[in-house]
């Protein structure tokens, strides 16, 4: 590989890592802001908005409505799914550009992964006999309002499984818009590692570390060590399997649907913006804004 090609591949990877950081900031804070807004509508007094959590319910608010008790814990995952479908329509209807398309694709996958992921994993996280304030997971808390109804939990588990498989499907299908020769395994590996593997690995490590400065970690490190890896590592596993399917495991698509490769030019402003956003997360958003 020539130095020019090595440089182009490095720039493609760095650009996609930066886009992955931006995509995460278009996903997790939206999830938490939905919690916050729903809690306020329900009549509760929010305490904090942070990258990894939002607004503990004020017990004095005395929310009696079963509907709002469910909504303030379950609505954020639903919002992720709705946004995911909106972004998927944008992906299908518009060609976008060599930077905007990977960004929209990553953000779509993250919203779907977060939304459907809660349905899937909270089936297992639900504790029928939790201690005070230790029920883990948004939808585990929803199930608590229905006394852990098994039929509801199984239904949501199935929806979650289908949703995560849908993320795998999106990852596989959409990747070929960036691959000019579907039969070139090296190109498939190069593109899939840039748009899926490296952003996944960097985000999983970086956001787990920066969230160590967040309210959940400070309040209960044991809870954090359960929740954060589940969300950042296992919750976004669609990126890893997207890479594996495209580069190694699944026979490539016969039909060529190539638009263009992800941007392989040096985008210093993009890198600086992503680094500044990450610094903002670490210094301000992860510790949280208190009301």
Predicted regions and their residues:
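N-terminal low-structure segments adjacent to metalloprotease catalytic domains
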Residues: 95-291
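Short, Lys/Arg-rich, polar N-terminal cytosolic tail immediately upstream
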Residues: 1-10
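Post-HExxH zinc-binding segment in Zn-dependent metallohydrolases
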Residues: 57-82, 109-111
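Select transmembrane alpha-helical segments in multipass membrane proteins
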Residues: 12-18
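Divalent metal-coordination and catalytic microenvironments
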Residues: 31, 76, 142
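Small-residue-rich helix-interface/hinge motifs
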Residues: 20-70
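Hydrophobic alpha-helical transmembrane segments
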Residues: 73-88, 157-168
């Amino acid at each position: 590989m020539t130095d020019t090609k090595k440089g182009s591949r490095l720039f493609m990877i760095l650009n996609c890592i930066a886009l992955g950081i931006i995509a995460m900031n278009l996903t997790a804070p939206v999830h938490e802001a939905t919690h916050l807004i729903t809690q306020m509508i329900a009549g509760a007094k929010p305490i904090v908005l942070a990258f990894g959590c939002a607004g503990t319910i004020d017990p004095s608010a005395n929310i009696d409505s079963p509907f709002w008790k469910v909504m303030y814990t379950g609505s954020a995952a639903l919002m992720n799914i709705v946004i995911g479908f909106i972004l998927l329509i944008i992906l299908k209807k518009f060609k976008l550009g060599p930077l905007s398309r990977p960004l929209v694709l990553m953000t779509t996958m993250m919203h779907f992964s977060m939304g459907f992921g809660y349905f899937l994993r909270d089936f297992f996280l639900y504790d029928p006999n939790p201690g005070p304030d230790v029920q883990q997971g948004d939808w585990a808390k929803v199930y608590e309002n229905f006394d852990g109804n098994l039929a509801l939990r199984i239904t949501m588990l199935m929806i979650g499984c289908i949703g995560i498989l849908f993320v795998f499907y999106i990852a596989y299908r959409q990747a070929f818009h960036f691959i000019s020769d579907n039969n070139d395994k090296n190109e498939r590996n190069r593109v899939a590692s840039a748009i899926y593997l490296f952003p996944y690995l960097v985000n999983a490590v970086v956001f787990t570390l920066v969230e160590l400065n967040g309210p959940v970690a400070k309040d209960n490190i044991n809870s954090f060590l359960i929740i954060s890896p589940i969300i950042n590592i296992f919750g976004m596993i669609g990126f890893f399997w997207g890479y594996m399917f495209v580069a190694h495991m699944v026979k490539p698509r016969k039909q060529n649907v190539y638009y263009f490769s992800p941007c392989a030019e040096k985008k210093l402003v993009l890198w600086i913006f992503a680094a500044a956003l990450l610094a903002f997360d670490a210094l301000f958003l992860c510790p949280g804004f208190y009301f």
